[in-house]
Amino acid sequence: TVISGLTVVLPNGDIINTGSRTKKTSAGYNLTNLFIGSEGTLGIITEVQLRLSPIPESIMSAVCHFPTLENAVQTAQQVIQYGVPIARIEMLNKDQMGISINYSKLKDIEAVPTLFFEFHGSEASNNENIKIVEEISKDNNGSSFKWAKDLEERNKLWKARWDVYYSVKALINNGRVYSTDVCLPISNITECVNYAEEQAKKFGLRAPMVGHLGDGNFHVLLPFDPENKETYKKIREFNDLLINKALELKGTITGEHGVGLHKKEYLLKEHADNIPLMKLIKRSIDQNNIMNPGKIFDLN
């Protein structure tokens, strides 16, 4: 699914339509992406025009266990580097696998770093690509490779992945989950993932982890009691270190969740040279600063 256009209400009340119904366009500035990335600071999006993808002839899923996170990440890197057509590559670390297994009462599955694959295409092409991914996984010490094409069986294979958030939240009575959101070049994921686990241990924090390895994004899901200020302070310090490490490794402070209120200081580190231009755009469209004031950056 691709967003091809928007209807936006501007701060002065004007209504504009961005994008086009055509498959591609080079007409003018890409206002669609500008408003999507503005986090509501430039206007109110009232309509979204979507270009839907056709449902694949066949969808297949697979899982594979690995002795180390390095093995799992290397497998994902090689699958991408070899150009294997794949829809999704998700990763759970050892801690998250153990949490999911306990929460969902899963059987015949190990609490070790695990990759979850999804393939879209014809049945013949999916079968061929599964064989290739299985071989790559085995070359990286992967084991217990399983795959399925039936929807019910696919959901069973991915059950540990689907229950990630609720399994972590259930660790603490009335607890909450703080999610990190760094994204890196795929070649640098291993170093950052290992760093995250090492720093979590130093802080005495549990660090269940889910990664969208196909695009270099991963989240450390940190459970905490909202009444425990000391733990929350440790989590914020941990996140600070992780973000700075990601920037050091040519990554970004947020792959999906956005800047909002709490990552403004890190945006200064990542895009200091670009912020004056962002402010210029903001002032030209929203002179009275009425659209999400204080989000992304402070005007003054």
Listing of model-derived features with the role each one plays in the protein:
Residues G40, V220, D286:
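Conserved, mostly hydrophobic/aromatic
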Residues S4-K24, E70, S187-N194, P226-E237, ...:
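A short, flexible low-complexity segment enriched in Lys/Arg and Gly/Pro that occurs
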Residues L247-V259, A272, Q287-M291:
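Alpha-helix capping/hinge segments and adjacent helical runs
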Residues D95, L213-N217, I253, G258-E265:
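Small/polar glycine-rich anion-binding or flexible loop at a beta-alpha turn
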Residues D14, K263-N300:
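Activity-critical C-terminal alpha-helical subdomain
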